[in-house]
Amino acid sequence: MASREDCVYTAKLAEQSERYDEMVQCMKQVAEMEAELSIEERNLLSVAYKNVIGAKRASWRIISSLEQKEQAKGNDKHVEIIKGYRAKIEKELSTCCDDVLKVIQENLLPKASTSESKVFFKKMEGDYYRYFAEFTVDEKRKEVADKSLAAYTEATEISNAELAPTHPIRLGLALNFSVFYFEIMNDADKACQLAKQAFDDAIAKLDEVPENMYKDSTLIMQLLRDNLTLWTSDACDEE
């Protein structure tokens, strides 16, 4: 079996060459090793899975949009073909989400010894249940949405108690949790409230941000503000 250092180095090579499936396999090996992940390893694992799932989520959105267009045209034959193709993508999405959630729950959370790593992995758990909710329906959708809500809520409790309002992980959690409320729960008010609170809390402490976190923190704050602008203008349009 390859050493930890070799796995991490190979994961970096895979990232450079945009071979994200291989990057996932390398970082899964590291996650299954005895020691807790370092910050660098944690970020590599997150990037690997995010790219794999990101490509599949993009495919699913394109196919779903095409399906609606063909339905509107009344083109039943094409709709049938698209539905079969969409089901194939959904099976891949489901496998990917199951895979990352298993790694988080069996390897990463049990070894997480700092508040930072606990929040990071609980947020990640919330994210992948949220991705599950994007393409599922009925009871399955409710089940994964509930699990996403529970993971985000637990992460938020730890984050609010232990991490500074300007910490990039705390801000990233607020960003994704607010997206969950907006997209999965269709609760724009709650989404805006959460995003605004996180943004305001961070602004109040902006002069205390460590130099090494400033760029990441302000980038996520900008994303929070962008979403708030978008969501509040949507609400105005609907009125």
Swiss-Prot record:
Q: Which PROSITE patterns match?
A: 1433_1 (PS00796), 1433_2 (PS00797)
The protein's superkingdom reads Eukaryota
Q: SMART domains, per this entry?
A: 14_3_3
One GO CC term, this protein: cytoplasm
Pfam families linked? 14-3-3
Q: Which GO terms describe its biological process?
A: protein localization; signal transduction
Indicate the family of this protein.
Belongs to the 14-3-3 family.
Q: What does this protein do?
A: Probable adapter protein.
User: What is the recorded name of this protein?
Assistant: 14-3-3 protein 1
| Taxonomic source organism | Entamoeba histolytica (strain ATCC 30459 / HM-1:IMSS / ABRM)
- Lineage per the UniProt record: Eukaryota, Amoebozoa, Evosea, Archamoebae, Mastigamoebida
